[in-house]
Amino acid sequence: MQKILATMMVLALTIAAQAERIDSTQFVAFYNYTIQTQDEEGQNVTDSIRLALLVGTRATYCTTVLSYNKDGRASQEMLDAFSMHFQNVLTDVEKSSVVAVEPIYPYRYETHEPMAKVDWTLTGDTLTISGLLCHRATGKLYGKQWTAWYTEEMPSSAGPWKLRGLPGLIIKAEDAEGIHCFTLYETKNEVIDINMIGSPEYQKLSRKKLMEFKKKTLGNPRYPKEPTYYVPEGADEVLEVNVNGTFYSVGYNSHMMILQKSHVYQPLELE
């Protein structure tokens, strides 16, 4: 019991860990992020998690709502976050640099890269989303073509994940295949710190090396039915955590939730 409680506390502390402050927010934008994919039986499914985009004048930070709320309890939403392999992304606009941290059981991976410039094409199309007048733009990022809707009513060049660079906050963005979609559902005017992310304990890779590793590992046909097929025996100690009658597998050493089944991996980056 003590070990289980300790693991749950470590999960919380891992999510809540803070580092040096580099900026503070002007506001926080909240998005639903969905992925159209297939389950282990090949049936179409929609994966979904909530994201928080912390927007400052110098930097932005995109993470899960669980991390934003410092909620480290084992839950289905946390399991979904691990399943969707969403990166925590810190964009330092002043330095034109991006740091991304992604948990891929049983390790966390950290990449550093220059801030990518999306060559957006602005159009005259408009659409009202959540009461905001939005303008359509198209652009390509890391091998994927995107359609984004932005609003000049919120004068920020920020957007979810690594999408940014438009003359207004990105309200909705969807890739050309209709697989990945980010949709704003709320904003809050609050001032909180934006901190540097990363740790000496994380595995350091280039963005392209991590992309290749994910393609080889998560893109393997075995992955949906055996999400830990590639993990060496003894790499972690697995515990069963009971949360209100629901049991979750948690890595005691990795501080990660462990998937028993997963869905077909759908990469955000192709090149």
What spans do the regions from the language model cover?
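A contiguous pocket-lining binding segment that forms or flanks enzyme active sites
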Residues: 165-180
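Beta-strand-dense domains in secreted/periplasmic systems and polymorphic toxin scaffolds
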Residues: 137-139, 173
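Short, surface-exposed, low-complexity cationic segments
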Residues: 140-164
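Extracellular or lumenal secretory-pathway regions
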Residues: 19-129, 133, 142, 146-147, ...
